[in-house]
Amino acid sequence: MTPHINAPAGAFADVVLMPGDPLRAKYIAETFLQDVKEITNVRNMLGFTGTYKGRKISVMGHGMGIPSCSIYTKELITEYGVKKIIRVGSCGAVRMDVKLRDVVIGFGACTDSKVNRIRFKNHDFAAIADFDMTMAAVQAAKAKGLNVHVGNLFSADLFYTPDVEMFDVMEKYGILGVEMEAAGIYGVAAEFGAKALTICTVSDHIRTHEQTTPEERQLTFNDMIEIALESVLIGDNA
C-alpha cells in the first residue's frame, strides 16, 4: 500500500492502462476485461485487474495534470513493480488534418511544465515513448484498419491557457494534440526504469471548436482502447 493506492502487493499486472478519468477506467475494465476485480479506490481513483484474451492487465485512473499522474505512475512502478504504462486519454487538435475522434499516438511529448527539468538537473529532457510499445500500437491499429497519427503531443500545465498564440506555434511545429500528462509520464518512466506510451483520441478541435460530450469521453473512444489492449499482446509476442 501507498498513501494513494490501497491495493495489496501483487494486485497489479505488469502492464497498466491509465485513463485520466477513474470512471473511464471502470468502463474499460467492465467492457473489455474478464474476471475483473477492483483493487484500489483511494480518493475514488479506481483501479482494476482482469484479463484480456487470457492476458492479465490492470487499468487505473491517473487524474488530471502532470502532478497527479506522476504520483500514481511513480508508485505503480516503484511499489507495485509495474513495467509498462499506457496512457489512454483525450487530446485537443490544433492541425486541420487531425480530425475529431482521430487516434493519436504520442511518440514524443513537449511541455511547458518544469517537472522534467527538475528531475534532469535543469536541462531539457527529450520525453519520448518506448519505441517497441509505439510500434506495437501502430501494428495493432493497422490490423484493425485504422489510420492513426504518430508524432509529438504537447503536455500543458494549464487547461485554460492565457497564451492562445501558442497554438499557432504548436501547429507550426507539427504538434498533433494538446493534453496534460504524457511528458510527465514519460519522465517518470525514464527516471524509474519503466516503459510508457500515450494513445489519445481527439475529443475537441481547438481551431474548429468541435467537441465531444463528457459522456462520449467517459464511455466511448473504443478504438483507442482496443489498440492499447492489442498492442500489449503484440508486445508479448515480439
Swiss-Prot record:
Active site: 204
Catalytic reactions of this protein: a purine D-ribonucleoside + phosphate = a purine nucleobase + alpha-D-ribose 1-phosphate; a purine 2'-deoxy-D-ribonucleoside + phosphate = a purine nucleobase + 2-deoxy-alpha-D-ribose 1-phosphate
Top-rank taxon, per record: Bacteria
Annotated GO biological process: purine nucleoside catabolic process
Keywords of this entry: Glycosyltransferase, Transferase
One Gene Ontology term of the molecular function aspect: purine-nucleoside phosphorylase activity
Annotated InterPro entries: DeoD-type, Nucleoside_phosphorylase_CS, Nucleoside_phosphorylase_d, Nucleoside_phosphorylase_sf
Top-level EC class: transferase
UniProt: a purine D-ribonucleoside binding residues: 4, 179-181, 203-204
Pfam families: PNP_UDP_1 (PF01048)
EC number from the UniProt entry: 2.4.2.1
UniProt: phosphate binding residues: 20, 24, 43, 87-90
PANTHER family: PURINE NUCLEOSIDE PHOSPHORYLASE DEOD-TYPE, URIDINE PHOSPHORYLASE
Main function: Catalyzes the reversible phosphorolytic breakdown of the N-glycosidic bond in the beta-(deoxy)ribonucleoside molecules, with the formation of the corresponding free purine bases and pentose-1-phosphate.
Similarity-based family: Belongs to the PNP/UDP phosphorylase family.
Stored NCBIfam families: deoD, PRK05819.1, PRK13374.1
Name of the protein: Purine nucleoside phosphorylase DeoD-type
